Amino acid sequence: MELGPEPPHRRRLLFACSPPPASQPVVKALFGASAAGGLSPVTNLTVTMDQLQGLGSDYEQPLEVKNNSNLQRMGSSESTDSGFCLDSPGPLDSKENLENPMRRIHSLPQKLLGCSPALKRSHSDSLDHDIFQLIDPDENKENEAFEFKKPVRPVSRGCLHSHGLQEGKDLFTQRQNSAPARMLSSNERDSSEPGNFIPLFTPQSPVTATLSDEDDGFVDLLDGENLKNEEETPSCMASLWTAPLVMRTTNLDNRCKLFDSPSLCSSSTRSVLKRPERSQEESPPGSTKRRKSMSGASPKESTNPEKAHETLHQSLSLASSPKGTIENILDNDPRDLIGDFSKGYLFHTVAGKHQDLKYISPEIMASVLNGKFANLIKEFVIIDCRYPYEYEGGHIKGAVNLHMEEEVEDFLLKKPIVPTDGKRVIVVFHCEFSSERGPRMCRYVRERDRLGNEYPKLHYPELYVLKGGYKEFFMKCQSYCEPPSYRPMHHEDFKEDLKKFRTKSRTWAGEKSKREMYSRLKKL
């Protein structure tokens, strides 16, 4: 039955429902007299839902629609592409839509054009044709009744890759989740070859609903996730879920560890309690020993002597380097070298009050006086920085009493002692406790020596301070003192001498500071 013409802004949806007898028409109007009597299309669709075939029914029939069908597809909204809830254009836009219709190009894939009679239209018909037309029974002799074709289930990447080459179409343009899972069909037809079906997915048995159910077809999208076909999953993936668990019996000890050497994969594990061998770099060059071969060594190591020889040669290349070039630079601290950085200190030094000075013990002083280092020392000078009355009360054998800095400079720097035959010239300073006067005199000599020579050259590069001074040396080595006695600085009998020498020292110290200032101004 064909409805009369209506205004363009009012769209009508015609459905066909054919009973088993072939004499009845193929297409049956969905909206009857009740729709004209005032019911909306959606209300009428709800009332006549039980008359539709394919939506929630217990049986499915394949649909074949030819490409040359007289149904045409005009400009529609997004809901029209999905097949549900057709919207209506406004009265002002109806004329413009008929004269210059705009078709959405990428809104719906080509394969979904045959999902329903409303979407399967021929582009060759006129544009002003009605939206839906009755299908001629002569053109559909094979189909006495038809149903709306359900949208195709979204295709996975694996299926797209496998079917894309066979069908020759772009399957990536299919709309994802355009309809509920219950509306998806099990077969689809290739539009380029009418009458032939290419099954994308094998038919499944979804949860069927009876005609008495109140299911309107709009099922939750989550239902489709629970009804996935097992055929969509590749066989290799399905075997992971269905195959039984198998325990591997491979011996893990025979496998190579991640950070183990490949040559030691088959060798036995070394004992944890065995002391590790020293590296060849730490041992001296001449005392390098052959490494003991392990009992379980692999045959590759024993049959490949060239590789072992190369590795051994590479190890010896670092050990055979001159000690004077690498080890002296890395191992020697500049504080352990004498003033000109040419060699190390001869005597063993001890910690003292001033960290920038080198201290020796009274025992070292006594050993030098005994001539123990005679073959290494050309001149051994002992500077006694105490006041003259202290020096006369007792001093070390061979010591020179110079309590004024000017006197020390004249004695040492005006006519410096030159070392010969590689022997050293050593100067030792001391006072009563080696706390103030001795260290101050030692610094002064080094300072004046630096000013008189080009860095780092020095006349006296090796200077020492006697730790504990004369008092400690007298208590430990009294036999090396002349006379063997000790007179302190604050002796009651020499208070006047103490004041005189202190005043002289302070006056000379003030004049010294003025002289240094004048000398610096002259250099500027």
UniProtKB/Swiss-Prot annotation:
GO molecular function: phosphoprotein phosphatase activity; protein kinase binding; protein tyrosine phosphatase activity; protein-folding chaperone binding
Consequence the record notes for mutating residue 293 to A: Increases basal stability and impairs CHEK1-dependent degradation following checkpoint activation
Motif KEN box location, chain numbering: 141-143
Catalyzed chemical reaction(s): O-phospho-L-tyrosyl-[protein] + H2O = L-tyrosyl-[protein] + phosphate
Effect of residue 76 to A: Abolishes ubiquitination and impairs CHEK1-dependent degradation following checkpoint activation
Cellular component GO terms, alphabetical: cytoplasm; cytosol; nucleoplasm; nucleus
Annotated control of activity: Stimulated by B-type cyclins. Stimulated by PIM1-mediated phosphorylation.
Result when mutating residue 514 to L: Abrogates binding to CCNB1
E.C. numbers: 3.1.3.48
Residue spans of biased composition, Basic and acidic residues class: 303-312
Keyword Cell division assigned: yes
Keyword annotations from UniProtKB, A to Z: Cell cycle, Cell division, Hydrolase, Mitosis, Phosphoprotein, Protein phosphatase, Ubl conjugation
Signal peptide start-end: none
Mutagenesis or variant effect for residue 513 to D: Mimicks phosphorylation state, leading to promote degradation following IR treatment
Annotated motif Phosphodegron, positions: 74-84
Residues recorded as bearing Phosphoserine in the entry: 76, 79, 82, 88, 107, 124, 178, 279, 293, 321, 513, 519
Known outcome of mutating residue 124 to A: Abrogates phosphorylation by CHEK2 and infrared-induced degradation. Increases basal stability and impairs CHEK1-dependent degradation following checkpoint activation
Stretches assigned to the Rhodanese domain: 376-482
PTM (free text): Phosphorylated by CHEK1 on Ser-76, Ser-124, Ser-178, Ser-279, Ser-293 and Thr-507 during checkpoint mediated cell cycle arrest. Also phosphorylated by CHEK2 on Ser-124, Ser-279, and Ser-293 during checkpoint mediated cell cycle arrest. Phosphorylation on Ser-178 and Thr-507 creates binding sites for YWHAE/14-3-3 epsilon which inhibits CDC25A. Phosphorylation on Ser-76, Ser-124, Ser-178, Ser-279 and Ser-293 may also promote ubiquitin-dependent proteolysis of CDC25A by the SCF complex. Ubiquitinated by the anaphase promoting complex/cyclosome (APC/C) ubiquitin ligase complex that contains FZR1/CDH1 during G1 phase leading to its degradation by the proteasome. Ubiquitinated by a SCF complex containing BTRC and FBXW11 during S phase leading to its degradation by the proteasome. Deubiquitination by USP17L2/DUB3 leads to its stabilization.
Residue numbers bearing the Phosphothreonine modification: 507
Annotated stretches, region: Disordered: 264-317
Similarity comment: Belongs to the MPI phosphatase family.
PANTHER family: M-PHASE INDUCER PHOSPHATASE 1, M-PHASE INDUCER PHOSPHATASE DUAL SPECIFICITY PHOSPHATASE CDC25
Assembly: Interacts with CCNB1/cyclin B1. Interacts with YWHAE/14-3-3 epsilon when phosphorylated. Interacts with CUL1 specifically when CUL1 is neddylated and active. Interacts with BTRC/BTRCP1 and FBXW11/BTRCP2. Interactions with CUL1, BTRC and FBXW11 are enhanced upon DNA damage. Interacts with CHEK2; mediates CDC25A phosphorylation and degradation in response to infrared-induced DNA damages. Interacts with HSP90AB1; prevents heat shock-mediated CDC25A degradation and contributes to cell cycle progression.
Function: Tyrosine protein phosphatase which functions as a dosage-dependent inducer of mitotic progression. Directly dephosphorylates CDK1 and stimulates its kinase activity. Also dephosphorylates CDK2 in complex with cyclin-E, in vitro.
Name used for this protein in its record: M-phase inducer phosphatase 1
